[in-house]
Amino acid sequence: MTQTYLTLNNGLKMPQFGLGVFLVPDGKETIDACLNAFKLGYRHIDTAHAYQNERGVGEAIKQSGLKRDEVWITTKLWPSEYGEGTTLQAIDKMLERLQTDYIDLLLLHQQVGDYLGAWKDMEKAVKFGKVKSIGISNFKENLEDLLSHTTIKPAAIQVECHPYYPQHELKMRMAEFGTVLESWYPLGHGDTKLLNEPILKKLADKYHKTPAQIILRWHIEEGNSVFPKSTNQAHIQENFDIFDFALTDEDMQQIAKLDCGKRYYTADLEEQKRFLSWKPAD
């Protein structure tokens, strides 16, 4: 099995497939999940300050024996860390938690708060060598405002994306900047309706795979970066077992028919402002 890579708009090559650790408890559970993934060939971990498990990710990399430049770390700043001056301090704390000298990809986790001040600090962090690439997550209503105030354009945008909601319009908008789309809820938030779609079951039979593996391969073919979350060793292995086949153009056209604009996360900008009242622990 061969890991695939995406070239970002700054020329860096990012492993396209990785392990997500959202809601994975810090400590042994995060460390074990990451170590199991590394043994199988995973080289990208997607975490966040809000996930409260960056320490476990950093410890796993340390224990793995892998060189730092062999593992890609994506992490995210919470709105409580946004603001000129504030964000640079938050990045330093992040580096300590991850036990590393630099972050491969740093994202703004939410589109509320002083994201413009935060972005200025993130651009400084790139200049200082503390961060290699910067991007955004969950930006929609405030996307254009951010784009109009950036010197460095986002290397990646992480949003909900799956066959029911493939984000074609957003991808077209970001194409001029060379921004890569990263998918969360890549399997439709575990919706059995999506996993039981006849076309996915048909393709699963055709390729001797599971419907989930077909969806994950669809993300690869779509050019999305994807990192399904799991702490189960068998699932971690199954999720990664998608590089020994490819979907045909006809397969992709059939899957494209599933696009129905269905989102699982529907909070609007006003509802998202509740994030401003929470502060993750250091």
Task: Label each region the model flagged.
Residues 24-28, 46-56, 80-85, 111-116, ...:
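Acidic-and-aromatic substrate-binding clefts and catalytic sites of carbohydrate-active enzymes
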Residues 110-282:
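Beta/alpha (TIM)-barrel catalytic core signal, keyed to glycine-rich beta->alpha loops juxtaposed to Asp/Glu
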Residues 25-37, 83-98, 117, 141-144, ...:
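Short, acidic/polar
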Residues 87-107, 124-128:
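CE4/NodB-like, metal-dependent polysaccharide N-deacetylase domain
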